[in-house]
Amino acid sequence: MNELRPKNRAYQGYHRREIPREDERLTHTDPNTPMGELMRRYWQPVCLSAQLADLPLALLIMGEELVAFRDGGGRVGVLHRHCTHRGASLEFGRIADRGIRCCYHGWHFDVDGTVIDTPGEPPGSTIKHNACQGAYPAREAHGLVFAYMGPPDAVPDFPDYDTFHLPGVELVPYSIRHDCNWLQVHENLMDPLHAVFLHSRMGAIQLTEAWGEMPVTEWLELGDRVCYVASRRIGGNVWVRFNEVATPNFGQVGGFWEDGLAETFFQRVGATRWTVPNDDRTSTIFGLRHFSERLEAKGIGNKALVGVESLDIYGQTGHRPYAEMQRNTGDWEAEVSQRPIAIHALEHRGTTDRGVVLLRNHLLRALGAPPAPPSAVGGIVPTYTSNTVVSVPAPPGADDRALLRAVGRKVADIVAAGNALDPRERPAIIAARLAALRGMKLEAGEAP
């Protein structure tokens, strides 16, 4: 009788040399790919507003070579990079009071791609009526430039999230290029367990010591969102972290410096971000770092460090000495080092990876469905991302992890149930409901 041979055997490199193909459905985003066409149905950031000065800016977004500029009238244009006349790059163009001119023969384009003038043509020439420069609708918000690259007859409303309007919060834009596929960067947001190891136990403490506590974690789908709820025991308190991503590449993360030592209720976002493919092997995070007295009470954050290729959170860019990256590895190295495109078929996924699997399946289902705009209340889209720290002592002689799970579920239910509230009143109402969880005990029948 043949016995089952264990796979965990020594020196098996020879038998593990084959590298399968990547999952093209999720990772490829060029024109006419399923994920690429889905992403093009949403407004995508393409650069920072501050990058558009007196010269055009060359861009690569989802495999398309583009150029962005701000004309003399202050309008932003996002055009195909190569001039429709003879293909010269408009990154070398001349910004005009209205639109941009190609440096080669002076063809003049408006921000919408229409041809204004073809100066080398004779009077009466109709060539400008038979040509146009590819262009995409563009708009600015909170220091970022967004473009809509989908069908022109299906432009969605621009999503206005509640965390963009919180009193006393300053939004500071940033961008970080990653030398890898967009998905392995994005799905890190649904992997809260990596923080225990990468940010805490495997090197220097990168955030606070509380991150090194192993959480009780659950993942859930709420409409267009995939979320995680991670509950940690910090002395007599329970710290519940609620993070979210939304279809297809939007995400928010809670405040970074929470230590769980003092109560806080529905403390909101530390960063909002979009993970935008440049091509299939490179991507850029465009984000908004959130600063407020409440979020930065410990004085750790630094607005001066936030911008192009810079963030005030350790390990988020590739601009550190290589030896330091090896000794105290950050998110950037962990994500980029999974290969230019991570190979899902080679993974041995465990319980810590449930959120990643849930996100991948969520995206696969989205590929076969029409884009669904996020639900808004009075034009404002409610979001969930938050930190809550509530005084709930550990039960003597009982299963504390079951209590942590129950507290996390209560927090998630309260936050999600507040979607229909007036956005101006929602934070205070949710915070009051969360405060009522103080001293919560495990009810009979509740189990891990």
Model-flagged regions — what are they?
Residues N2-E65:
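Zn-dependent metallo-beta-lactamase
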